[in-house]
């Protein structure tokens, strides 16, 4: 049968459930769709056609239109990392707007299980080794509502943990950026993280939350000075 239904006897949690689904999958691609989201009838066909056009790509993702050219557009690992870490960002999206080549997902080891930031971690792991395809927007609909996992992460400040993942990726031997680009990317991330922490502590008056994040991301009080430096 083309469609099979598998039920978990217990709630496995977000990422363990996705890993189990990937283990059951037999197809060339993985397409996750959370129960509160929607993919339009043409969406899957567009995603698959784009991935077939670029067989060396591990990840396809819906992105806003770009003046640089039409989609689908394929990016090298270096170009993808440069756009995310030195440009306006690239990997800040969830699985609803993504399609993954199954072989690459398995070679990368699947999701680590880090709550809230596991998607981002997987995207940069894939992008370090394989090409990435930009897809047009409008293929899916992502619903926001109270009680969903995304809102839980926002309210618990869990998404700040993406800083540690980004810093590890920039320091990894597999990072496709040059040494000069890595240095600039690290400076940018540190400055933004420092500004986020100060905003949380001062403007939002969440001192304890800011301190917990600083400890978890090994960001020392003196490191906050980087928030006042000019952009690299």
Regions found by a protein language model. Give the residues of each.
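Acidic donor-binding segment of Leloir-type glycosyltransferases
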Residues: 1-7
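Glycine-rich, basic loop-to-helix element that forms the pyrophosphate-binding segment
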Residues: 7-25
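Short glycine/serine/threonine-enriched helix-capping/active-site loop
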Residues: 8, 57-64, 135, 142
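Short aromatic/hydrophobic "clamp" motif used to bind/position activated sugar donors
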Residues: 30
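The conserved acidic donor/metal-binding loop of glycosyltransferases
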Residues: 34-38
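Conserved donor NDP-sugar-binding/catalytic core segment of glycosyltransferases
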Residues: 42-73
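Conserved nucleotide-sugar donor-binding catalytic segment
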Residues: 77-163
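C-terminal subregions of glycosyltransferases and related glycan-biosynthesis enzymes
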Residues: 121, 144-232
